[in-house]
């Protein structure tokens, strides 16, 4: 049986946690930041977690994570 390729884009975006979940970065924090409030930017800063509905897709993209 051949090895399964890891989706490299997913490998750069998601990191597996000890509990089996995946960390991800929030969107909307790259550019056009002047019109966004400090509170909004601050809440986007910490890492988020992948939702249960998307977990299967991420696991399929990262077979060895």
UniProtKB/Swiss-Prot annotation:
SUPFAM superfamilies reported for this sequence: L35p-like
One of the record's GO cellular component terms: cytosolic large ribosomal subunit
InterPro entries, per the entry: Ribosomal_bL35 (IPR001706), Ribosomal_bL35-like (IPR021137), Ribosomal_bL35_CS (IPR018265), Ribosomal_bL35_sf (IPR037229)
Superkingdom as given in the UniProt entry: Bacteria
PROSITE patterns in alphabetical order: RIBOSOMAL_L35
Gene3D superfamilies (alphabetical): 4.10.410.60
Entries under Pfam families matching the protein: Ribosomal_L35p
Keywords: Ribonucleoprotein, Ribosomal protein
Gene Ontology biological-process entries: translation
A molecular function (GO) term: structural constituent of ribosome
Record keyword tRNA-binding present: no
NCBIfam families tied to this protein: rpmI_bact
Family: Belongs to the bacterial ribosomal protein bL35 family.
HAMAP family: Ribosomal_bL35
Protein name, per record: Large ribosomal subunit protein bL35
Organism encoding this protein: Proteus mirabilis (strain HI4320)
Gene that encodes it: rpmI
């Amino acid at each position: 049986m051949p090895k399964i390729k890891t989706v490299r884009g997913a490998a750069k975006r998601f990191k597996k946690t000890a509990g089996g979940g995946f960390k991800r970065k929030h969107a909307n924090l790259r550019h056009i930041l002047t019109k966004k409030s400090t509170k909004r930017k601050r809440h986007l800063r910490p890492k988020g977690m992948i939702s249960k509905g998307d977990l299967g897709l991420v696991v399929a993209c990262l077979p060895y994570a």
